[in-house]
């Protein structure tokens, strides 16, 4: 089985979006707001790495991966799995935002700080979670085609590992091609969402949520 050019093209498009959208967004934001500092961007990226890619994964290990009655229940009930995933992401990422604005960025004023932070938080997620994943997948499928198909590629590994590798590759190749394109497009709305959440948490920490909501009410 060879990989279709449509799938490879969609992987490439998503990789470009995921890798370069955060950079373009930061450059445009920096050009339009020359006085902003890069510190909030770096803090946002660092918070995502620490809270989402490190601390949250430790929690996932104990709740999802480690064999226990809890993991069996959560993995065995789709509603519990979805609820846990949503709560875990919310708790860890919003706690990270809160602590960042409360400590490292406590002296930073104005919504520009929150927006710059949001670009860093959502941008590094886009690059690490989707961008690198798409690049890795694209390299893999190009190698499969260069080898003449899945079976020739699988033959390169030891016999005891071939079954698992073949199953994983077939799962990847049977994924609808448009799914890979959607992964990149979804990053656009996700980064916007991260920026919006960062602004909300920023004003919450500053105690200005109510005032801003009232201002919005009277303006509208």
Show where each model-derived region lies:
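Hydrophobic alpha-helical segments at protein termini of multi-pass membrane proteins
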Residues: 1-220
């Amino acid at each position: 089985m060879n990989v279709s050019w449509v799938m490879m093209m969609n992987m490439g498009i998503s990789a470009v979006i995921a890798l370069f959208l955060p950079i373009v967004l930061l450059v445009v934001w920096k050009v339009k707001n020359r006085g902003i500092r890069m510190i909030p961007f770096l803090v946002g990226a660092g918070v995502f790495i620490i809270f989402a890619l490190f601390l949250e994964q430790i929690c996932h290990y104990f709740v999802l991966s480690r064999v226990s009655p809890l993991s069996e229940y959560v993995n065995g009930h789709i509603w519990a799995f979805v609820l846990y995933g949503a709560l875990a992401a919310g708790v860890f990422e919003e706690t990270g935002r809160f602590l960042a604005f409360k400590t490292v960025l406590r002296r930073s004023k104005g919504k520009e700080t929150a927006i710059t932070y949001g670009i860093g938080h959502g941008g590094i997620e886009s690059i690490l979670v989707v961008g690198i994943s798409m690049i890795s997948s694209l390299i893999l499928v190009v190698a499969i085609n260069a080898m003449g198909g899945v079976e020739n590629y699988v033959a390169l590994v030891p016999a005891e590992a071939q079954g698992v590798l073949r199953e994983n590759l077939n799962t990847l190749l049977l994924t609808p091609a448009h799914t890979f394109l959607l992964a990149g497009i979804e990053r656009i709305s996700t980064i916007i969402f991260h920026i919006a959440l960062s602004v909300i948490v920023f004003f919450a920490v500053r105690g200005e949520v109510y005032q801003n909501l009232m201002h919005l009410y009277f303006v509208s």
